[in-house]
Structures are given as C-alpha cells and as structure tokens.
C-alpha cells in the first residue's frame, strides 16, 4: 500500500480544536479525531500513544511507520484504503519492548439503540448484559467492551495499568443522548484492573470511579473493578431448579438459617473461609440441623467489613473476600444439590458515600436525589436511590435479575423496606418533602417495589421475596394486581418485638403482659409472615438471645428452649440467626467467628439438640407448616390463662391432622393441669423442651394421656397433664 503525503492536522477532519481537547483530556467524541477517516486522496489513520516511541500500521504492504505529528504522542498515516480493523505495532518508549495490538478506534460501537431506549425508559431488566464489561468479538477480534452511564460527563475514559491510568488514552464514545458511553478495547485479558475517569461537563471536576455494573472487584481496601473472565462453570442443579419451579411454597416448610459468611467460622489464623470451604462445612451442618434455606447477609461487594455488607458498592459482584464468582456459583450449586435453598440479603434502599462508587457518580446526583431531604439517609449516613429515575430503576431491577439468573439464587430478602416507603422515615417536620399529593408515601419507591416483585415472580418461578418492613403498611405480601406490594412474605417484626419483650420479663410479672403472647393472632393472617430472630437482635448492646432471657442460668436456658418451642410452633415461616441455635453467649461480633467452643458445655449442646429436633419436627409435620398463612391452621385452646402464664393452641394440616401445643411461661411445674382437646382419644407427648436431653428437669407426660370425658375451653373433651417449668410440650 502506497503512503501519501500528510495533510496538515489543522486542515483534516477534526483539526486543531479536537487535538487540543484530546491532549487536555476533554475530547467528548474521540471517534471524530482518532481512528480512520476519509480524506482527499485516501484515508487517514490517527492514534494517540503517549507512551510509545514509534508506531507502525499494518497495511497490505506490511507494517509501515506512522509519522509522529505531535510530540505528546499523536501518530498519523495517510494512504490508500486501510483494512478494517487494523493492527498497530508499538515500541514502548521506556523499555523498547515491541508489541502488536489493534486500535480501539478501529471498531464500531455495538450496543443497540433499542437497548439504550429500554434502559432510558427503565425497562431494561437485564442491563448487566449491556453496561459494565463483557468479553465479546467485534469484527472477528476478541476484546472487552466497556459501557457506563454518565449523562453529565464531558468525557469518560477507561483507565488501568494497561494505559498508565491516563485518562487521555482511552476516551469512550458517547452514545447519542442516552448518557451511555462505550468503548471496545481489543486483546485486553480477563482480570485486568480498570476504573472510569470522568470529567464533569459543568465544573470540570475529575472523578475516578469504579464500574457500577462490574461483576468482579479487587480485594478490599482496593476498589478497582476487574475485566471479566469467561465463566466455565457447569451447573449441576437442574433437578432443584425444576422442583423449585413447581414448588407450593405457601404450604411448604420454610426454615431459614441467617448467616454472615465472614464470621460463621474462620481458620485458626483468623482468615476467612472461602466459598468452597463454606460449602464443604456449612451444608452438612444445615442438613443435620434441619434448615430448608440459608440466608446470606449481603455478599454484594462492599468496602468495610463492619458494615456487614449493607453498604454496597458492587451491586453485581459477589465479594472477593471469599473467592471469585465461579466459587460462589459452586456454593449455591452444592446447596441446591443438597436440597438447601439460598437467599440473599439485597439492599436497594440506600448506598454509601464512598467517593469511588455510586455517590455523585458523574459529578452530579445521578443515582441519588440532589435534595438531601429526599436523597440522604440521616440514620446511616448514606444516599437514598432516586427510584423515579428510569435508569436507576433499570440498574436496581437488573441487579435483582442478575443474582437470580446468573447465580440461581432462590430469593431476595429486601432490606429496610420501611425506609423506602415513607418520605418522612426517621425525619422531623421540615426535614422531608411530601409527594405530589401532599402525602408521606414514597410513590416512586412503591412503584419500584411492585415492579421488582412482578419481575421476580414472573421470570423466576418459585423464587421468593421477603420484606423487612417494620410498620403497619398494608398488603406488603399481597399480589400487585390486588393493590399489594407483591412480596412473598413479610418479616413479622411485631411478633419478634412482643415476644422478646415478654421473654425478658421476670416470670412473676408475665401475667400482666399476657397480651404480648396473644395479640399477634389478631393480625397474623393479614400478611404472609415469617417469624424472625435475626442478627439485628443480637448486636449493638441488645445482648444475645440467651442473655436477654430472665432468671438464673438454669432459667435463662429454659426460657431460651421455651422461646424456640414457641417460635417453631407458631404460625409463620421461620428464620434464626447463626449462633442462636447453640445459645451464643456474647453478642455477634463481625470480626470473630462464633463461639463454637461453647458446644463443649452441656447446656449449649442441649439448646442445639433441641432446635435440631424442633427443626426436623417442623419440616416433617404438615400441621406445623402447611397452613402457616391461613386461619384454618391455628386455633386457640386457651389464651386466657394469664394468671398462670400458660397458653395452649392447636396447629392443623390440610388433611385435618393436628398437634396440640401447651406452653408454660413460669418456673412453676403444674400438675393436674386440664387442657381442652378437639377429639376424644388418647394423646402422646412427642416433644418436651424440659427433657434432660436438652438440659431440662425431665418433668413431663410419659405414656398415653387419656381423655376425661369432660368438655373444657369450648372443646369436646379434655385431658389432665403435667406442665414442666419454663417449657413447652407438643402432643399428638
């Protein structure tokens, strides 16, 4: 190919203005200056390589030297038609090393206008396929496509070790008026560190930001993203996924073990278990203990261990603390093969102020509101998402979709829903702005939550959503077409607070607070409730569950056994935080593993054995789970015996089978206690929390319990039993 005389840069397509903008790192449209352009007499190729001493262009005649037209590193070549894409040969100025690579500006953009339109409309539910980084082929060449949303930027560049973190070298292409920037960089290996350098168009502020859509980040405290490595993981959970799709979860047992990966167990040197090690140690434990699901506190990437994962900076990335994405896939897959579902805590309510992440991403309030009365969470020092902005909605919906799709997650526990629903949440008069109707409801957040639940239940059969919602907002777990928010279940914070308040009372005072045990049944079927004893109740000076219990040491353990018996027999699905199951003595400490050594002591082993037996009884007994959400599944036998602090009730299954539960909340054994029964037949005691196996005094009812023929408490017959102290019994 014949080389032609160079035109003056001031007379070609872009001219001096574009050159000056490029060198000042302000070039908004790099494709107008860099790359290949038609000029009189042929084509012009222009590249910017400030760290190279010489550059050659591959032509049909071989590699030809490009002329350095500016000592800052601008090289040009003009000649006849150039093959697309074209290869460059580069000599590094410092080392003299020569390498060959394709020019990023030789390739066209790839993202379709239709996808950009859907993203801007808030209807691109898989935006992670468009934005972020992807290993793709462009004109037959393998490379990494970068795309980021930054509508208020004058210039956005990809920076990393590969270009000396120099924002002048790889400026991105602005995609029309979508606010999206795109660039294809050929031959960039997976695992390459990168960020986006953004120049705000109004202020000129330069920001260095990590990729909001990245799927991998380097290990904290560093925070650069990594280009993706093609996943070769082969899932083995097809049987689970097929079974889940037809799962009747309304009538199924759901018993969740809530877990923080970094503090469940650690190696002797204090290092974390990897995702693979967690699978090897946790799954057998979950099976032995009788849990149907494990819920992980947020494993989305986050910079600070002490945040427990709730201040997320990577909404599409499993944290690198415990391994890579394929390792997390392995964990989920192994759970599924063992019959264990995996639920993730997911945090769409707020995000941290860290300057490298979402906060004022392009120099403006992009993901958050500009007005702090809408956009700043005073309690947590975080920013509140702008749910009314379509692109933010696409971002959050796509994050949920990503976890459920890519990682086969079985459900999302949505954190802090109450803070999303109310504009005046934790705010004084004058610190919040009303909605367009003058009310306190966050209408945009409500619409977002409904869209979230519609998407999850419509696209992921059998997947569940759980709302941590602490107010009396109606119909949280009712379908959106009936005006509800559409969640599968709602945390029953009222039951939790009333129950824990009651259990902390000295038994001598409990008869004055009997309504705290019975009030729950007035609203128990207004929602699909799950009964939580969660991490929030065992930190920040609230004390461990064991330490909350009243009385001396024996009574504290007896009260805890009684609490678990009450929880596991009450209507509603179940969730317990790690450590509760063996009576962790101290509050949860995020930087230490649980106090597993306590299992060397009989009372703690007794609590673990009790909860294991209760869990399996719950899983195996339809009367304890089939009608959790229906009035037909529960009826009081006697809720009025406040003087003796005793309650009794029956749980029923769809086939009419039932169990009787009698709970004594005082340390006084009660002999000759009469209980009404719904059928005149013999009964047996199948569970007693006062058993010596669990550390109790072994007071109970061995053998058959025969009916007396006397009606009682509105029942057709009655039995005479012995009630053990601070204990519950179950009869069939």
Swiss-Prot record:
CDD domains with a match to the protein in the record: AmyAc_Glg_BE, E_set_GBE_prok_N
Pathway named in the protein's UniProt entry: Glycan biosynthesis; glycogen biosynthesis
Keywords carried by this UniProt record: Carbohydrate metabolism, Glycogen biosynthesis, Glycogen metabolism, Glycosyltransferase, Transferase
Pfam families per UniProt: Alpha-amylase (PF00128), Alpha-amylase_C (PF02806), CBM_48 (PF02922), GlgB_N (PF22019)
Catalytic activity: Transfers a segment of a (1->4)-alpha-D-glucan chain to a primary hydroxy group in a similar glucan chain
Domain of life: Bacteria
Annotated Gene Ontology cellular component terms: cytosol
Enzyme Commission number: 2.4.1.18
Catalytic residues as annotated in Swiss-Prot or TrEMBL: 415 (nucleophile), 468 (proton donor)
GO molecular function: 1,4-alpha-glucan branching enzyme activity; cation binding; hydrolase activity, hydrolyzing O-glycosyl compounds
Entries under InterPro entries matching the protein: A-amylase/branching_C (IPR006048), Branching_enzy (IPR037439), GlgB (IPR006407), GlgB_N (IPR054169), GlgB_N_E_set_prok (IPR044143), Glyco_hydro_13_cat_dom (IPR006047), Glyco_hydro_13_N (IPR004193), Glyco_hydro_b (IPR013780)
BP GO annotations: glycogen biosynthetic process
UniProt function note: Catalyzes the formation of the alpha-1,6-glucosidic linkages in glycogen by scission of a 1,4-alpha-linked oligosaccharide from growing alpha-1,4-glucan chains and the subsequent attachment of the oligosaccharide to the alpha-1,6 position.
PANTHER family to which the protein is assigned, alphabetical: 1,4-ALPHA-GLUCAN-BRANCHING ENZYME
Subunit structure: Monomer.
Family annotation (HAMAP family): GlgB
Protein family (similarity comment): Belongs to the glycosyl hydrolase 13 family. GlgB subfamily.
NCBIfam families, per database record: branching_enzym, PRK05402.1, PRK12313.1
Protein name (Swiss-Prot/TrEMBL): 1,4-alpha-glucan branching enzyme GlgB
């Amino acid at each position: 190919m014949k080389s032609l005389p160079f035109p003056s840069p001031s007379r070609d397509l872009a001219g001096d203005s574009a050159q000056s903008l490029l060198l000042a790192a302000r070039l908004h449209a790099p494709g107008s200056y860099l790359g290949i352009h038609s000029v009189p007499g042929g084509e012009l190729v222009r590249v910017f390589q400030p760290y190279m001493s010489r550059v050659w262009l591959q032509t049909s005649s071989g590699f030809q030297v490009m002329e350095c037209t500016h000592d800052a590193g601008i090289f040009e070549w003009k000649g006849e038609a150039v093959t697309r894409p074209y290869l460059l040969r580069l000599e590094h100025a410092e080392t003299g090393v020569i390498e060959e690579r394709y020019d990023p500006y030789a390739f066209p953009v790839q993202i379709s206008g239709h996808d950009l339109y859907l993203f801007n409309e808030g209807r691109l539910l898989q935006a992670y396929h468009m934005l972020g980084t992807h290993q793709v082929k462009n004109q037959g060449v393998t490379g990494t496509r970068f795309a980021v949303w930054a509508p208020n930027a004058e210039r956005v560049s990809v920076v990393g070790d590969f270009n000396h973190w120099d924002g002048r070298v790889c400026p991105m292409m602005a995609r029309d008026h979508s606010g999206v920037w795109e660039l294809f960089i050929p031959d960039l290996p997976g695992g390459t560190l990168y960020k986006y350098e953004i120049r705000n168009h109004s202020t000129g502020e330069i920001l260095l930001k990590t990729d909001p859509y990245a799927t991998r980040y380097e290990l904290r405290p560093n925070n650069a993203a990594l280009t993706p490595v093609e996943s070769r993981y082969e899932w083995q959970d097809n049987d689970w996924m097929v079974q889940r799709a037809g799962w009747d979860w309304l009538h199924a047992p759901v018993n969740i073990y809530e877990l923080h990966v970094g503090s469940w167990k650690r190696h002797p040197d204090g290092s974390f278990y990897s995702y693979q090690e967690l699978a090897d140690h946790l799954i057998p434990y979950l099976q032995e203990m009788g849990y149907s699901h494990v819920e992980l506190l947020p494993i989305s990437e986050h910079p600070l261990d002490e945040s427990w994962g709730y201040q997320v900076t990577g909404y599409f990335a499993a944290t690198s603390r415990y391994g890579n994405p394929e390792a997390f896939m392995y964990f989920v897959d192994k759970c599924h093969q063992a019959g264990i579902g995996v639920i993730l805590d997911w945090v769409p309510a707020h995000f941290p102020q860290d300057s490298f992440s979402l906060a004022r991403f392009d120099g403006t309030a992009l993901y958050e509101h500009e007005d702090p009365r809408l956009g700043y969470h005073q309690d947590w020092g975080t920013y509140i998402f702008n749910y009314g902005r379509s692109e933010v909605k696409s971002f959050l919906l796509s994050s949920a979709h990503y976890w459920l799709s890519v990682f086969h997650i079985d459900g999302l526990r949505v954190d802090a829903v109450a803070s999303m629903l109310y504009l005046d949440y934790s705010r004084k008069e004058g610190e919040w702005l009303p909605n367009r109707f003058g009310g306190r409801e966050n209408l945009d957040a409500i619409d977002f939550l409904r869209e979230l639940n519609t998407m999850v239940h419509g696209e992921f059969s059998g997947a569940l959503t759980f709302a941590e919602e602490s107010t009396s907002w109606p119909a949280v777990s009712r379908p959106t077409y009936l005006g509800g928010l559409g969640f599968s279940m709602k945390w029953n914070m009222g039951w939790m607070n009333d129950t824990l308040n009651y259990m902390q009372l000295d038994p001598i005072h409990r008869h004055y607070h009997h309504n705290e045990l019975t009030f729950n049944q007035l609203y128990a079927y207004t929602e699909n409730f799950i009964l939580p004893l969660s991490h929030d109740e065992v930190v920040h000076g609230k004390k461990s569950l064991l330490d909350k219990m009243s009385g001396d040491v024996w009574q504290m353990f007896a009260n805890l056994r009684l609490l678990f018996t009450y929880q596991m027999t009450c209507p509603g699905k179940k969730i317990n935080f790690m450590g509760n199951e063996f009576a962790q003595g101290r509050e949860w400490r995020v930087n230490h593993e649980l106090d597993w050594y306590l299992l060397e002591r009989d009372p703690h082993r007794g609590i673990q054995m009790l909860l294991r037996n209760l869990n399996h009884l719950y899983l195996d007994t339809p009367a304890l789970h089939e009608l959790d959400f229906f009035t037909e599944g529960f009826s009081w036998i006697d809720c009025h015996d406040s003087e003796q602090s005793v309650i009794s009730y029956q749980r029923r299954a769809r086939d009419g089978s039932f169990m009787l539960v009698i709970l004594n909340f005082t340390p006084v054994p009660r002999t000759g206690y009469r209980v009404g029964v719904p059928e005149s037949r013999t009964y047996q005691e199948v569970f007693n929390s006062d058993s010596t196996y669990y550390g109790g005094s072994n007071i109970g009812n061995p053998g058959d319990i025969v009916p007396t023929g006397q009606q009682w408490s509105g029942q057709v017959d009655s039995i005479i039993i012995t009630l053990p102290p601070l204990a519950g019994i179950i009869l069939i």
